Amino acid sequence: MRLTGPWKLWLWMSIFLLPASTSVTVRDKTEESCPILRIEGHQLTYDNINKLEVSGFDLGDSFSLRRAFCESDKTCFKLGSALLIRDTIKIFPKGLPEEYSVAAMFRVRRNAKKERWFLWQVLNQQNIPQISIVVDGGKKVVEFMFQATEGDVLNYIFRNRELRPLFDRQWHKLGISIQSQVISLYMDCNLIARRQTDEKDTVDFHGRTVIATRASDGKPVDIELHQLKIYCSANLIAQETCCEISDTKCPEQDGFGNIASSWVTAHASKMSSYLPAKQELKDQCQCIPNKGEAGLPGAPGSPGQKGHKGEPGENGLHGAPGFPGQKGEQGFEGSKGETGEKGEQGEKGDPALAGLNGENGLKGDLGPHGPPGPKGEKGDTGPPGPPALPGSLGIQGPQGPPGKEGQRGRRGKTGPPGKPGPPGPPGPPGIQGIHQTLGGYYNKDNKGNDEHEAGGLKGDKGETGLPGFPGSVGPKGQKGEPGEPFTKGEKGDRGEPGVIGSQGVKGEPGDPGPPGLIGSPGLKGQQGSAGSMGPRGPPGDVGLPGEHGIPGKQGIKGEKGDPGGIIGPPGLPGPKGEAGPPGKSLPGEPGLDGNPGAPGPRGPKGERGLPGVHGSPGDIGPQGIGIPGRTGAQGPAGEPGIQGPRGLPGLPGTPGTPGNDGVPGRDGKPGLPGPPGDPIALPLLGDIGALLKNFCGNCQASVPGLKSNKGEEGGAGEPGKYDSMARKGDIGPRGPPGIPGREGPKGSKGERGYPGIPGEKGDEGLQGIPGIPGAPGPTGPPGLMGRTGHPGPTGAKGEKGSDGPPGKPGPPGPPGIPFNERNGMSSLYKIKGGVNVPSYPGPPGPPGPKGDPGPVGEPGAMGLPGLEGFPGVKGDRGPAGPPGIAGMSGKPGAPGPPGVPGEPGERGPVGDIGFPGPEGPSGKPGINGKDGIPGAQGIMGKPGDRGPKGERGDQGIPGDRGSQGERGKPGLTGMKGAIGPMGPPGNKGSMGSPGHQGPPGSPGIPGIPADAVSFEEIKKYINQEVLRIFEERMAVFLSQLKLPAAMLAAQAYGRPGPPGKDGLPGPPGDPGPQGYRGQKGERGEPGIGLPGSPGLPGTSALGLPGSPGAPGPQGPPGPSGRCNPEDCLYPVSHAHQRTGGN
């Protein structure tokens, strides 16, 4: 079998690292058996603890208990009334480590102040306790019981004065640290006591686990439980804080986010009383005076265990409107229009009145991809393009003839630095580099290939390698001595450096590195092939004004655009627009000639002129001599030359390609209203609420919209016309990725790189927190008139209509069927008098005449409450509510894309005075007026309809014990119980009457000789009798125990099976000799009927067994002998009572 790289690495680590340690520590078992536990705020101190690595079990979540607010700032588990018993294997699927700690935070209520209850208990398959934490309110003690290796149950009782506040009906924290031979008890973050223990037995995790249960009847105890956790470390309980139960609350901050120093001084001593020993105040319950800046994102947490399915939540309040959505996908590129000819310069218009700033128009959709336009003139040199993948080297062309020397141009502006490109193909060897010593990896005497005399330059920085495979789990450390809690160790010395790991697999390409230092110039290389055209650069500086071009032809009128989409958020106010066209009013009277003005300042630089005509090609130079040289590196920039004389203006060039979109101009005056556009064809969505109810019964009303699919790509355009003039083409499409090059040597760390390319649009994030209502935006322009909408949802129920005309009196109907008396409503449906004759309802008669109003009857007695109905079907969506109060101003929207600047048109004639325009858009909401005078008292309204059923309230506080109820009706036949107790010996019955004389039998077969007795059958019969007596005595004792173990034992039996069928009677046999006493018959079938009333007291002096008395003093050990069931059942009676404390 061939081993791959990762397997070789694993095998190497297994051989060399595994022998280092052969012991198995608790830490490995902890990592294997305990999940990661969620820790809240200041629950643990941060000394030597990484909150992401705390492991353990939250028993409240494991028992699927619901949380509810028991105070304004605290939540508690709802214990309910069901038994809090679960299979242990479901709570601890992989068991518990040898050392662990239990942390609980609770408040004892009044009813449980003196009760004895189990905080946590683990039972084995025989329902015998293995681990128990008992809180006894009557004795004011805490007990910890566990099973030792010898099989005895050891009981450690903590009876300390410091434990008395645990029962004062206030919040307290109780913690127990269980180590191999030490038990420590903590209360309110203080160490109360510590006990040495015997070695504990292994725990059987195939039984049951109980929490917060009364010892008397196994029902949940009346406490408020905030926390019940098991940490998979015995030392974590010492790191618990008591910030939740401390009465030190952080004060209100002043306007500057500070806390008064007097408050800190006054509460420092009070807070220190809640801190554990040897711990400083600065580590505990600090009040943060001001919120700091957001930290860096934390490391991703490991995935948690799948939680239980939660119950459907109640309908939340309507959220505030969300933020504007992300920018939609870019539409198809618009068609490229023909270049219009430049019009003549218009005459200077009369000064117009400053128009009002118009509202920003709606952003139009991008048009479909148009055919390619005519080829434009060569544009200015653009900035360096994005890094291209290395293309294949072209064939070396012949050297061209030297051209005529052109005029020296002006020095251009320094372009922005280009983005770093990928590593190019290996270049030719450079000049001799400086030798450097690189440790023991490279030798300065190493030589290159024979054909290259000089050493190469330092290569570009190599790509970052992939992360190596994770190493195998290290050897297990030996178990350390149990440390003293609270002692903070000093910082250890720095460890020895680890062994250098094996080289990882080649990584994925890393991010482009920063630009390296400028290298020394290389040898002059051969002239390379012409590179591809870079992307279009930004507009260059404005050139000198060119001559007026020939007037262009009138362009073709574009098609009418589609109506805009949904009105977007109002954009930012645009820059001040240019002066609008002359007003439509009549020209005013000519004014008087003004005085000549002072000479104005120098005007701005004119626009760039049109490009000149291509120069004539130069003469062909002589053929060069020599071998083509290598491609040289780019030389240093030359000094700026002397500015040459200004050239003659060139001839008008051909029209250029349209430039980039200009900056949006200032808003002009509002135009006249256009003709009504085509209505938008909206898809028929129908009633969303009704559609949702067909799929789910508990959906929210809002539904995300469907995402449009991307349209198909347009077909190829028509082939272009052949152009005889060979000009440099536009930049071509990006070529396919080249073959990955070999991994270069690791380069030095470069400088900080330039900002990267903006990333792609990410996935849609979760719905954010509703923001503060924005200020009212400016009123948008009136939209186009749409088509008539679809019929709206059904309106609200109208008011009651007027009474219809009275109908004719109908014939009397037959008597109805008597109504059965059920649900306490019989008095409403009884038919009085006569015999109830069954009949069927007749056809409905016409409405009778309206009778006179009868006298007001006496108020009826309050009826019994009806049964709780089933939840109704979700109703249709109600009508829209009244418009809400105007919100605050929203954030300014993103500026719209700049429009294409239009060509200046010819000046038109002055028009006549137009008709009054349409009514303008509604103005912004005015300032709220003062409250008006209160109106007169209105007429008393009609009583409203009955409101909907309220939400279910939280569980109330248990009330006082009620009075003794009446005797209940006999219940249904219960399940088969455990074997009943053996009753006391009954009185000897009277002699029965002799039976009827039977028919004489035929002579029997001679019997077996008397001396051939089967001792095996006698032995079997004795064993059966002894077993029967033992089971009956055992059942008596179990029925008298009021413990969860006794309750669980009763649940272990199944239901009785159906009685078997009677067999056919056999033929009468011959009477044989008198046989031995028969065996015990099978248990008879259960009797039919309700249990009988208690019988009269028996005449025997022996009464029924009494309830167990209080445990007496321990007696001397008795002699070994037979086992009494009362002594063998529950080992707790032989537990070693080990008390401690004061």
UniProtKB/Swiss-Prot annotation:
Q: Where is the signal peptide?
A: 1-23
Q: Which SMART domains match?
A: TSPN
Query: Would the keyword Repeat be found if you checked this record's keyword annotation?
Result: yes
Q: Where is the composition biased (Pro residues)?
A: 417-429, 806-817, 840-852, 1108-1119
Q: Where is this region: Triple-helical region 3 (COL3)?
A: 448-688
Q: In which tissues is it expressed?
A: Localized to vascular, neuronal, mesenchymal, and some epithelial basement membrane zones in umbilical cord.
What Gene Ontology terms describe where this protein resides (cellular component)?
A: collagen trimer; collagen-containing extracellular matrix; endoplasmic reticulum lumen; extracellular matrix; extracellular region; extracellular space
Q: Where is this region: Triple-helical region 6 (COL6)?
A: 1054-1111
Give the domain of life. Answer: Eukaryota
Q: Where is the Laminin G-like domain?
A: 50-234
Q: Which GO terms describe its biological process?
A: cell adhesion; cell differentiation; cell-cell adhesion; extracellular matrix organization; skeletal muscle tissue development; skeletal system development
Which keywords has UniProt assigned to this entry? Cell adhesion, Collagen, Developmental protein, Differentiation, Disulfide bond, Extracellular matrix, Hydroxylation, Myogenesis, Repeat, Secreted, Signal
The answer to whether keyword Disulfide bond applies is: yes
> Which InterPro entries does the record cross-reference, listed alphabetically?
Collagen (IPR008160), Collagen_superfamily (IPR050149), ConA-like_dom_sf (IPR013320), TSPN-like_N (IPR048287)
Annotated spans, Triple-helical region 1 (COL1): 292-351
GO MF entries: extracellular matrix structural constituent; extracellular matrix structural constituent conferring tensile strength; protein-macromolecule adaptor activity
Per the record, the similarity remark reads: Belongs to the fibril-associated collagens with interrupted helices (FACIT) family.
Domains: entry comment? The numerous interruptions in the triple helix may make this molecule either elastic or flexible.
Q: How does it assemble?
A: Oligomer; disulfide-linked.
- Any idea what this protein is called? Collagen alpha-1(XIX) chain
User: Which gene specifies this protein's sequence?
Assistant: COL19A1
